[in-house]
């Protein structure tokens, strides 16, 4: 199934919204901090690349990968 650009962007926006909520609720981040984390992550780059198919996964799955990236960045 081929999505229109509008449909694809809607899915991305919904996923980002969920990740922002998770960061705020689970990690106590402010909204600005949460947006900064998401939009500056490699996960966001992959999410917005239709070829990766990451946008087809659940927000929870995507958030788990974001958490792994955040942990990896802390350890460096």
Question: For each predicted feature, which ranges?
Answer:
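C-terminal alpha-helical interaction appendages
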Residues: 1-76
């Amino acid at each position: 199934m081929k999505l229109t650009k509008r449909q694809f962007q809607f899915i991305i926006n919904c996923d980002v919204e969920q990740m922002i909520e998770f960061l705020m609720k689970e990690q106590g981040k402010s909204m600005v901090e949460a947006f900064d984390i998401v939009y500056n992550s490699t996960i966001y780059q992959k999410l917005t690349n239709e070829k990766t198919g990451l946008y087809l996964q659940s927000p929870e799955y995507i958030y788990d990968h974001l958490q792994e990236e955040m942990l990896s960045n802390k350890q460096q």
